[in-house]
């Protein structure tokens, strides 16, 4: 019998709402196909995908992320006791500071003038003032699971951008700066003009989505034959003029879709199999226009589970994922017993049962 293919799971950006969509899709994959997304040989996360991927790589199963995202009471688990602060919106607690009315990155702004096509969106946002919202709440969420250091997963890559040079940095990959996972995720999520840049070892970092919505091209350097990519920021569906799936939204999603399509084609030319999952029409209606909305994730989670399950059933996509080694039962679906009785093996050290 041939060995199963080595896998890379690529999770793109998309704010709080995109993160909720990815969690719902990952749960559908686990329950419908029997494959544990956290068992991927590589996990590559950008922006919201770095938060979700970091949790998976730290051994948090999708069903627990579902419970966290919906704010469900899980008595007996530190930090997951059911208060409103446990919703996805906890990562957007507002810690304001007022920026100076100057360029956030004068060095990158000047570089973008000399080479206007080299830096993409990062070169444009260099001209904005610095963001006003602290990333500390993001770090707090990660530290609940990984208090310090990196996740135990051998190949968790977190993508950010050096805000002064415009260069892409892949934390967790060999040769990259050695930082805590909480700091790397905060850097990857630091939307310019919204969040503060994250200072690490004398450098400032911003959202890795300023290079690519998924950074799917990094999978070319991964020792993996099968690449599974979830991209909340693209879709093949169009709706009415002012709907989230309509032509106005499609215009903004179009660039993301075309870039990801080019990345997919490049990987396939290298002999890799690529499975791309994107929001369906119902998902787009649930997601709305505001990807940082704290009111939307609950309904997005439920919708994503439903639409992804329907897409997987009887499809080649579902068959390809079902052919992968089956995950442990308690990683695929939630135990029927009370949370306080769940075995410690279910959780990373930061989420042990009290």
Please identify what each model-predicted range represents.
Residues 1-46, 51-354:
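Patatin-like phospholipase
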């Amino acid at each position: 019998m041939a060995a199963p293919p080595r896998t890379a799971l690529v999770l793109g950006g998309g704010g709080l709402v995109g993160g909720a969509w990815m969690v719902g899709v990952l749960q559908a994959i686990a329950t419908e196909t029997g494959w544990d997304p956290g068992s991927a040989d590589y996990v590559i996360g950008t922006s919201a995908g770095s938060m979700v991927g970091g949790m998976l790589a730290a051994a948090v199963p999708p069903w627990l992320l579902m419970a966290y995202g919906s704010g469900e009471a899980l008595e007996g688990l530190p930090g997951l006791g059911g208060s409103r602060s446990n919703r996805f919106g906890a990562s957007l607690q507002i810690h304001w500071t007022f920026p100076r009315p100057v360029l956030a990155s004068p060095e990158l702004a000047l570089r973008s003038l000399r080479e206007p096509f080299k830096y993409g969106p990062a070169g444009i946002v260099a001209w904005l003032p610095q963001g006003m919202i602290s990333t500390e709440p993001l770090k707090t969420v990660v530290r609940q699971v990984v208090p310090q250091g990196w996740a135990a997963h051998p190949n968790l890559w977190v993508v950010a951008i050096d805000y002064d040079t415009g260069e892409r940095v892949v934390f967790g990959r060999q040769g990259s700066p050695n930082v805590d996972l909480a700091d790397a995720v905060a850097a990857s999520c630091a939307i310019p003009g919204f969040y503060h840049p994250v200072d690490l070892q004398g450098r400032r970092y911003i959202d890795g989505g300023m290079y690519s919505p998924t950074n799917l091209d990094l999978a070319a350097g991964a020792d993996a034959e099968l690449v599974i990519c979830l991209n909340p920021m693209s879709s093949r569906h169009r709706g009415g003029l002012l709907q989230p799936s309509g032509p106005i939204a499609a215009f903004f999603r179009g660039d993301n879709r075309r870039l990801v399509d080019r990345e997919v084609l490049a990987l396939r030319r290298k002999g890799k199999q690529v499975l791309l999952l994107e929001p369906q029409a119902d998902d787009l209606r649930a997601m709305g226009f505001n990807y940082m909305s704290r009111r939307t994730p609950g309904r997005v989670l439920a919708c994503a589970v439903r639409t992804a399950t329907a897409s997987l059933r009887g499809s080649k996509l579902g068959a390809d994922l079902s052919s992968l080694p089956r995950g442990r039962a308690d990683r695929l679906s939630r135990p029927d017993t009370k949370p306080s009785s769940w075995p410690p093996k279910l959780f990373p050290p930061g989420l042990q049962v009290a």
